[in-house]
Amino acid sequence: MPFGSEPPQLLRRKLFYQGRKFAYEVNRLRLPNKVEGEFECVRHPGGALVIPVTPEGKLVLVRQYRFTVKSRILEFPAGTVEEGEDPAATVEREIQEETGYKAAEIEKLGEFFLAPGYSDEIIYAFLGKGLEQLEQPPEQDDDEDIEVVLMTPEEVEQAILSGDLADAKSISAFVIARSMLMSQ
């Protein structure tokens, strides 16, 4: 039976974990068809991602270790949007912290949910143009080991197809920006 536009009714919400970056909760809902069920949800404040482009048309990516997948993965610079922070400010900070570049211009590409089946995390995607290398790159945090990787848009596309770039937020943002990047 289709639900139509009627939203489910929240019967009970139970918070199981509140961490620094996310919360985990279980919600008891009554659906419009009167069926009741429990739905798990990861609450996240949102993230911002940037595709930095050098004046030569190269894209700046980072390769870093991600404990959750026990691997060093290739991705575009991104970070959690802090409370009250504009997502554009998040990417300006992340470009500098993760790559040692500064963008003269930040252009919004769009926004999308990362995994709406279990999380409310939204990703704000941007293009960073007019990059300049910082004279003094910031020091990496003790828990970060980041390698900066420069690639052409065509090389990024090949990295996606080969599985070297397997980060969903980076792939989604690249798809949004692809036509702009390939025409430069």
Label every PLM stretch briefly.
Residues G47-E75:
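A glycine-rich, hydrophobic loop/mini-helix early in the fold
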Residues M1-L15:
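Extended interaction-bearing regions that mediate binding to partners or small molecules
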Residues S179-Q184:
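Generic C-terminal helix-cap and adjacent flexible tail
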